[in-house]
């Protein structure tokens, strides 16, 4: 069975994300002074003693306001409770019980999930006991005085929490593929996530920038497990104010770093923008495999040549990503969305691929035969002794040469193009490491690598 889920519920600005960070032992959720920072429900692992579980951090609940996001946040909170084994209701010990707390408590009593009442911001253990007693009136049992920032009282809360979780069972760890959905604001990342999930999991709104956390969702398809990461849209730095959006963009960059494959979402109407080029550079820099997802294809007037023309225009801008598979989709209508995971699988396979040293040196030998290494003005010619793959994700090949400085950028690009031509590696960048090596060292290495 999957890990049990613990939902964290409460009104805005009571410290839900701070407590979630404490339980998860990290700073994953955005914590900022602006109320209502967490809009979607976000998942990450937590543990206590010998028990593992998933923490679900939800948006701030308000029942007396129907503006824009609040009905959507209520839906997200209910969805979190429906999949949870237990819930932690967080209240603010410094303000005392509020009307909002009473409304949430009434609502929670109607849910079939055990609820623990955590009275947050009780920084003093002695004063915290007094602050906590005010919350008996909520009718949810024993209030636990805690400090999400300092950790006071969280041990007792967790001791009781794990008694409500299902008994430990063997959990088979699948070979999970982590997929980050990356793109500028409002290109349809959350709509794409929803289309992949088949449910309304991430908040979708026409307002640019409505996904502010990196949100992990685990799905299975054809016995393969995928972790889908929907991120905040990435804007130009000059358009980003210091605050929650700044941290979200940081989170998106971290999502690129920790994923296996990037679904790089591009707006079919706008085409490849300058900001897309900067994003592409970042993806290459992190060595991630890529699937180019051209979204909003339903909004484009098409004839039999349209896809060819679009591909030509896209790769004229993203010429350094010509190896990336490309798919034209509509997240709104579902057009071709079911083909995306096939491309994710093939790109992941190439990203993890290993090539034998013998094959690498066959490619090098043919490449050098067709185009000799350059010669310096002093008449000294570059020489490639041999190559070998030293790592994967991305595939990285070390080339041992007499002097790396003798190989200009044009020749380095030529060698990379020969590896692409002979070995393929579609969907993933490859890295070439040019390493200087003396003749004597090469001779000593001859027993484990074929010289070119």
Curated annotation (Swiss-Prot):
Alphabetically ordered keywords of this record: GTP-binding, Nucleotide-binding, Repeat, Ribosome biogenesis
GO molecular function, one term: ribosome binding
Xref: Pfam families: KH_dom-like (PF14714), MMR_HSR1 (PF01926)
InterPro entries with a match to the protein in the record: AAA+_ATPase (IPR003593), G_ENGA (IPR031166), GTP-bd (IPR006073), GTPase_Der (IPR016484), KH_dom-like (IPR032859), KH_dom-like_a/b (IPR015946), P-loop_NTPase (IPR027417), Small_GTP-bd (IPR005225)
Binding site for GTP 2: 183-190, 230-234, 295-298
Example GO BP: ribosome biogenesis
Chain ranges of the KH-like domain: 353-438
Domain EngA-type G: 4-169, 177-352
Entry binding sites for GTP 1: 10-17, 57-61, 120-123
Gene3D superfamilies: 3.30.300.20, P-loop containing nucleotide triphosphate hydrolases (3.40.50.300)
Tagged with keyword Lipid metabolism: no
Domain of life: Bacteria
Cited SMART domains: AAA
Family: Belongs to the TRAFAC class TrmE-Era-EngA-EngB-Septin-like GTPase superfamily. EngA (Der) GTPase family.
Function: GTPase that plays an essential role in the late steps of ribosome biogenesis.
Oligomeric and partner information: Associates with the 50S ribosomal subunit.
HAMAP family found in the cross-reference section: GTPase_Der (MF_00195)
Annotated protein name in UniProt: GTPase Der
Species name: Rippkaea orientalis (strain PCC 8801 / RF-1) (Cyanothece sp. (strain PCC 8801))
Lineage summary: Bacteria, Bacillati, Cyanobacteriota, Cyanophyceae, Oscillatoriophycideae
Gene it is expressed from: der
């Amino acid at each position: 069975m999957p890990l049990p889920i613990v939902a964290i519920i409460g009104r805005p600005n009571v410290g839900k994300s701070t407590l979630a960070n404490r339980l998860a032992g990290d700073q994953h959720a955005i914590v900022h002074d602006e109320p209502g920072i967490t809009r979607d429900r976000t998942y990450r692992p937590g543990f206590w003693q010998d028990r593992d579980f998933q923490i679900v951090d939800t948006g701030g609940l308000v029942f007396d306001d129907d503006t824009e996001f609040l009905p959507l946040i209520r839906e997200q909170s209910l969805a979190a409770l429906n999949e949870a084994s237990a819930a932690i209701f967080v209240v603010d010990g410094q303000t005392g019980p509020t009307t909002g707390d009473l409304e949430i408590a009434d609502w929670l009593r109607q849910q079939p999930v055990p609820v623990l009442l955590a009275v947050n911001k009780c920084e003093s253990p002695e004063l915290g006991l007094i602050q906590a007693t005010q919350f008996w009136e909520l009718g949810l049992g024993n209030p636990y005085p805690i400090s999400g920032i300092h950790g006071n009282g969280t041990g007792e809360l967790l001791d009781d929490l794990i008694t409500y979780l299902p008994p430990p069972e063997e959990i088979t760890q699948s070979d999970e593929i982590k997929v980050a959905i990356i793109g500028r604001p409002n290109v349809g990342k959350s709509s794409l996530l929803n289309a992949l999930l088949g449910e309304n999991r991430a908040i979708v709104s026409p307002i640019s920038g409505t996904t502010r956390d990196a949100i992990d969702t685990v799905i299975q398809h054809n016995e393969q497990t995928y972790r889908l990461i929907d991120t905040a849209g990435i804007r130009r730095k000059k358009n980003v104010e210091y605050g929650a959006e700044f941290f979200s963009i940081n989170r998106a960059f971290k999502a690129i770093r920790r994923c296996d494959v990037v679904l790089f979402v591009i707006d079919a109407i706008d085409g490849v923008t300058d900001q897309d080029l900067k994003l592409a550079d970042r993806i290459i820099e992190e060595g991630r495999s890529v699937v180019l997802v051209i979204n909003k294809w339903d909004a484009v007037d098409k004839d039999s040549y349209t896809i060819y023309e679009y591909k030509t225009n896209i790769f004229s801008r993203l010429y350094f990503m010509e190896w990336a598979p490309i798919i034209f989709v509509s997240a709104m209508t579902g057009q071709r969305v079911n083909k995306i995971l096939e491309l994710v699988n093939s790109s992941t396979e190439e990203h993890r691929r290993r090539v034998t040293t013998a094959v690498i040196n066959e490619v090098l030998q043919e490449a050098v035969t067709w185009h000799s290494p350059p010669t310096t003005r002093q008449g000294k010619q570059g020489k490639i002794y041999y190559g070998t793959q030293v790592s994967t994700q991305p595939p990285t090949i070390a080339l041992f040469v007499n002097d790396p400085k003798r190989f200009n950028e044009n020749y380095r690009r030529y060698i990379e193009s020969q590896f692409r031509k002979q070995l393929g590696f579609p969907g993933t960048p490859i890295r070439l490491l040019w390493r200087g090596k003396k003749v004597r060292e090469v001779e000593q290495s001859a027993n484990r690598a074929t010289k070119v």
